């Protein structure tokens, strides 16, 4: 297999369709996959790679649950996994984050996702591809995930930047989703969509633009960066962008603000509770 980058261009992927150790995964909603997908792609349902419990919407599942999900799509350790979705790649990014957390070695995201492929006139198929089931063993490392306790331990660390990637309205409490609005103390804010060029098939902006977006808010490579949103859906995309840019010390908060904002013992800046 060639040495694909973290974000792969659709035209770069095209000549490798059918390569033996290439596994293309469409993690869009099932109906989108049925209507058309990259030739050879198998479908993976997003709910299979997240775990709801208590007030948490999308934590990382236990090892045995992840093992079943990845085995069902025939994943093997030697596969280079190429992933995309139809919603500008947050689901694809969450799966890539999960693969990195379990130390799967080779993975990429299609730059622009499904739009980056089909809107540029590349071939599309509608055949439902049924994979041969594998036995894929999962062991989480904890190196990519920031737990609530981990974040609490870093709140006063000057070498750590906590990055909130939610909508402006969530950050400012105009939109309240959890019991307690607000933000993790000290967090800086950058809406995850700022890095995506809607006029270029939802591909990423050039690297210099991306770096400037982050530098303006103090997100620099020398720091450890912890990214979060409500469910580590949008923040997973920002995680991938940071890794693409060469940031080596990045973690994602899998349980997200759905855990932090529904807990009773977490510190919150600009806390807001709607009593109506």
Kindly give the residue locations of the regions a language model identified.
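Flexible, polar/low-complexity N-terminal or interdomain linker segments that lie immediately upstream
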Residues: 1-35, 89, 111-179, 268, ...
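Terminal peptide-recognition signature
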Residues: 13, 41, 99, 117, ...
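Helix-loop module immediately N-terminal to the HCX5R catalytic loop
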Residues: 51-80, 193-225
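Thiolate-centered catalytic microenvironments shared by cysteine-dependent enzyme domains
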Residues: 58-154, 174-175, 182, 234-251, ...
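A mid-sequence, solvent-exposed acidic-amphipathic segment
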Residues: 156, 162-205, 213
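C-terminal soluble interaction/assembly domains
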Residues: 226-227, 245, 265
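Cysteine-dependent PTP/DSP-like catalytic domain, specifically the C-terminal lobe
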Residues: 251-276
């Amino acid at each position: 297999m060639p040495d694909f980058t973290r974000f792969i261009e659709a035209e770069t992927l095209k000549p490798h369709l059918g390569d033996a150790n290439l596994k293309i995964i469409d993690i869009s909603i099932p109906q989108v996959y049925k209507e058309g997908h990259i030739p050879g792609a198998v479908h993976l349902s997003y709910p299979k790679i997240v775990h709801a419990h208590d007030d948490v919407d999308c934590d990382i599942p236990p090892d045995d649950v992840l093992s079943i999900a990845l085995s069902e799509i025939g994943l093997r350790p030697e596969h280079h996994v190429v992933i995309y979705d139809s919603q500008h790649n947050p689901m694809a990014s969450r799966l890539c984050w999960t693969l990195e957390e379990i130390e799967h070695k080779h993975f990429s995201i299609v730059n622009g996702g499904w739009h980056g492929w089909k809107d540029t006139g590349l071939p599309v198929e509608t055949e439902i591809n049924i994979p041969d089931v594998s036995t894929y063993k999962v062991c989480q490392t904890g190196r990519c995930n920031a737990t609530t306790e981990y974040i609490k331990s870093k709140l006063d660390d000057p070498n750590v930047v906590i990055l909130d990637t939610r909508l402006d309205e969530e950050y400012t409490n105009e939109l309240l989703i959890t019991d307690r609005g607000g933000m993790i103390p000290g967090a800086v804010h950058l809406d995850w969509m700022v890095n995506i060029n809607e006029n270029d098939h939802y591909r990423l902006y050039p690297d210099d633009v991306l770096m400037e977006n982050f530098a303006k808010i103090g997100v620099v490579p020398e720091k450890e960066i912890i990214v979060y949103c409500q469910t580590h859906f949008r923040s997973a995309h920002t995680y991938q962008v940071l890794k693409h840019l060469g940031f080596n010390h990045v973690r994602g908060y899998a349980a997200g603000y759905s855990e932090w904002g529904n807990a009773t013992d977490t510190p919150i800046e600009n806390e807001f509770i709607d009593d109506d």
